[in-house]
From Swiss-Prot:
The protein's name: Cobyrinate a,c-diamide synthase
GO biological process, one term: cobalamin biosynthetic process
Free-text note regarding domains: Comprises of two domains. The C-terminal domain contains the binding site for glutamine and catalyzes the hydrolysis of this substrate to glutamate and ammonia. The N-terminal domain is anticipated to bind ATP and cobyrinate and catalyzes the ultimate synthesis of the diamide product. The ammonia produced via the glutaminase domain is probably translocated to the adjacent domain via a molecular tunnel, where it reacts with an activated intermediate.
Residues flagged as site, Increases nucleophilicity of active site Cys: 423
Catalysis: reaction(s): cob(II)yrinate + 2 L-glutamine + 2 ATP + 2 H2O = cob(II)yrinate a,c diamide + 2 L-glutamate + 2 ADP + 2 phosphate + 2 H(+)
Organism: Clostridium tetani (strain Massachusetts / E88)
Gene: cbiA
The protein's Enzyme Commission number: 6.3.5.11
SUPFAM superfamilies the UniProt entry points to: Class I glutamine amidotransferase-like, P-loop containing nucleoside triphosphate hydrolases
InterPro entries xref list: CbiA/CobB_synth (IPR004484), Class_I_gatase-like (IPR029062), CobQ/CobB/MinD/ParA_Nub-bd_dom (IPR002586), GATase_3 (IPR011698), P-loop_NTPase (IPR027417)
Superkingdom, natural source: Bacteria
Keywords, alphabetical: ATP-binding, Cobalamin biosynthesis, Glutamine amidotransferase, Ligase, Magnesium, Nucleotide-binding
Gene3D superfamilies attached to this UniProt entry: 3.40.50.880, P-loop containing nucleotide triphosphate hydrolases
Amino acid sequence: MKSIVISSNSSGGGKTTIAVGIMKALMKKGFDVQGYKVGPDYIDPAFHSQITGKPSRNLDIYLTGEEGVKASYSRGKGNLGVVEGVMGLYDGKGIDSKYSTAHVAKTLGLPVVLVLSPKAQSATLCAEINGLINFDKVEIGGIILNNISESYYNLLKAAIEYNCNAKVLGYIPKDERLKIGSRHLGLIQSSEIEDLEEKIDICSEHILKNIDLEELFKIFKKTPEYEDNFHLENKNLKIAVAYDKAFSFYYRDNIELLEELGEITYFSPLMDKELPKDIDFLYIGGGYPEVFIEELSKNESMLKSIKEELDKGLKCYAECGGLMYLTEAIENEDLKGNAVGYFEGFSKMTKRLQNFGYAQLEVYKENEILPKGLKINCHEFHKSTVELDEDKIFKINKTMYNGDTKHWNCGYIKGNTIAAYAHVNFLGNIEFLKALLEK
């Protein structure tokens, strides 16, 4: 597979718009495209998947390590890969570029196409571009200018190619039709945008018209065959995964590892009446249960089914929205609805982010599921809290940008159920997954 990385100088620079537009444009040209996303985000990969018809893949060095990123990348399918970056090109976990888009690009040996959305700049923009080019040994293959007029583009193209050792590939004109709304986790889910196909099609037409595709094709680079040693032995397990509009945040790596362990049955907490029969493990990922709390609470037979099975000792792992769903109730402004009620207490939405970013869990409580001292790299992003009268199992360690470390206890254990706000990629935490399933 040949691939490129789409990055920018900051968040909000147009990466997602350009990345999905390029994917669609390439597909119109007859290519089989694989989407990738740098970092832990769940939303952008859903856009990729909607366009390409295949699961997008997260490439996250903090959550999976460099070898995990290589393995996940190698599992992609298609002739061309488009990797959407995160934040600015060199922005990672701390004040250096570790775990950044640049780190991923260098790990995979891929060139970067910069997407920039300039305003009232010319020579200063060139200085910024030269800084991006010279900051580290990342191959900058070209530049796409976003959300500008044709006359401004002509001015900037001349300035950049005069002052910078960089090729300007084209531009995307200002177009109000390309705007996408937002929700508290960033972009809203692709399945909720009624005119998503139209927006993507408009963007792809701009790309076909205003981007030099011949030059873009020259930037795509073939990568070597990377080793993939992240596999598990089939245990003939029957695994139930909650999946619908309320619960859709799952890393593709996690699903594939569970598929290796046995057979996955997907079910909908919104629509189905009860859990699948004779299952060995229940996985409830994140999502937006607070948005659909009325529908979830009305499905009383499902709530009862889950609680009964957990009370009987069914093994379960729940993340973020899954944790909220297992409490007694979810409060969202004026809305309040009953949830599963396995954990004593409730969850409540907040206006501000409670925790955000990379961290590391450490099992500090003696228990029968996870070995004490086990460390698990994770990511948190939530605007809610839980108040539960249950045993906590993890100590979380979070390194701040200034180098200080914050600690607090989190995550809950009851019976054979473990639930926490943290999102975990099993590819980088194989021992954690094994422990969840081996009791």
